[in-house]
């Protein structure tokens, strides 16, 4: 996957799951580990890292401090 695709996946997970996106990605990461899917594990590790870099979802009409 390209860097752009990884960022797109991270953004999509945040849109779908809000502040639970990190937890969702972590569960998928664990599933890849249990399945011994090294490529899938790497992808989800990259997505998880990008979600954490994006920070928390701030509801519309509020400001982040």
What are these regions, as identified by a protein language model?
Residues 1, 48, 61-62:
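Intrinsically disordered/low-complexity terminal segments and short unstructured peptides
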Residues 11-56:
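Amphipathic, hydrophobic secondary-structure cores in small proteins
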Residues 1-12, 65:
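Short, charge-rich, low-complexity alpha-helical interaction segments
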Residues 53-65:
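Short, charged, intrinsically disordered terminal tails
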Residues 4-6, 31, 60:
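Generic signature of intrinsically disordered, low-complexity, basic-rich segments
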């Amino acid at each position: 996957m390209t860097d752009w695709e990884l960022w797109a996946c991270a953004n999509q997970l945040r849109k779908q799951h809000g502040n639970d996106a990190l937890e969702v990605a972590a569960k998928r990461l664990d599933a890849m580990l249990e399945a011994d899917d090294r490529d899938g594990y790497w992808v989800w590790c990259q997505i998880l890292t990008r979600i954490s870099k994006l920070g928390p979802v701030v509801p519309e009409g509020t400001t982040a401090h």
